């Protein structure tokens, strides 16, 4: 159903693994997370953002220490809504490690609704995937991909998803979802949208979009209008 459900799923997994953990998210995080905090009744702490929209890592560590939190649940942005800022996964992990918290003792969700379909196609992308240390990631299908109906995909580690799996005998299946019944058309639309372009076509499409964005920034700044 879009980025909000993907983010809820990631936060839900984090809460199930660490029931008493605190969710840390920055001021530039999507507004849906404040709703998710209420729905999941999860402890949370708001972290300051840097001027570019990226998480303030010093403030993150300061607040984890202040809370004496041993099992933080980190909400990282891979492309914020307004500035497109990408939180540095490597810095987050290094900073938490310096607190003496081992990797197995915290959860890291990545909200890649905006940039999850951009970074795989650019040279030298910022860290954002499972190899870089995340536990779950959500990507929207109606943003860069261009599906006409809001949709998205969330990917998480199987061992964590299995923790919330419930056997439903009358449908002979295990339920691992939040919403249960879902729209059967949107996955097809998202699949078709992805398949409609080759890898190289996606690279060219994204490169053109980034170049156009940079051109707009340059024009604004040359006219004395602050832009980023």
Curated annotation (Swiss-Prot):
Enzyme class of the recorded protein, top EC level: lyase
EC identifiers of the protein: 4.1.1.22
Natural source organism: Raoultella ornithinolytica (Klebsiella ornithinolytica)
UniProt KW Transferase keyword: no
Lyase listed as a keyword: yes
Gene Ontology BP annotations: carboxylic acid metabolic process
Source domain of life: Bacteria
NCBIfam families: PRK02769.1 (NF002748)
PROSITE patterns: DDC_GAD_HDC_YDC (PS00392)
Any one GO molecular function term: pyridoxal phosphate binding
Binding site for substrate: 30
Gene name of the record: hdc
Name of the protein this chain belongs to: Histidine decarboxylase
Subunit (UniProt): Homotetramer.
Database matches in InterPro entries: Group_II_Decarboxylase, PyrdxlP-dep_de-COase, PyrdxlP-dep_Trfase, PyrdxlP-dep_Trfase_major, Pyridoxal-P_BS
Cofactor(s), by name: pyridoxal 5'-phosphate
N6-(pyridoxal phosphate)lysine: modified positions: 143
Additional remarks: This histamine-producing bacteria (HPB) causes histamine fish poisoning.
Keywords tagged on the record: Decarboxylase, Lyase, Pyridoxal phosphate
Family: Belongs to the group II decarboxylase family.
Catalysed reaction equations from the record: L-histidine + H(+) = histamine + CO2
């Amino acid at each position: 159903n879009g980025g909000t459900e993907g983010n809820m799923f990631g936060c839900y997994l984090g809460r199930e693994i660490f029931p008493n953990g605190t969710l840390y998210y920055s001021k530039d995080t999507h507004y849906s997370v404040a709703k998710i905090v209420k729905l999941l009744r999860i402890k949370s702490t708001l972290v300051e953002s840097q001027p570019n929209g990226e998480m303030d890592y010093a403030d993150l560590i300061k607040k984890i220490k202040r809370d004496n939190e041993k099992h933080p649940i980190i909400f990282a942005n891979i492309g914020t809504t307004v500035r497109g800022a990408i939180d540095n996964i490597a810095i987050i992990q290094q900073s938490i490690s310096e607190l003496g918290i081992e990797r197995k003792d915290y959860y890291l969700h990545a909200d890649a609704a905006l940039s999850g379909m951009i970074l795989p196609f650019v040279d030298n992308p910022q860290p954002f995937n499972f190899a870089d240390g995340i536990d779950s990631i959500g990507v929207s299908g109606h943003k860069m991909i261009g599906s006409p109906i809001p949709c998205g995909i969330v990917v998480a580690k199987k061992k964590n998803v299995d923790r919330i799996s419930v056997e439903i005998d009358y449908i002979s299946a295990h339920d691992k979802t939040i919403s249960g019944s879902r729209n059967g058309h949107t996955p097809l639309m998202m699949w078709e949208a992805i398949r409609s372009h080759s890898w190289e076509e996606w690279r060219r499409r994204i490169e053109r979009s980034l170049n156009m964005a940079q051109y707009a920034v340059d024009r604004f700044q040359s006219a004395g209008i602050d832009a980023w």
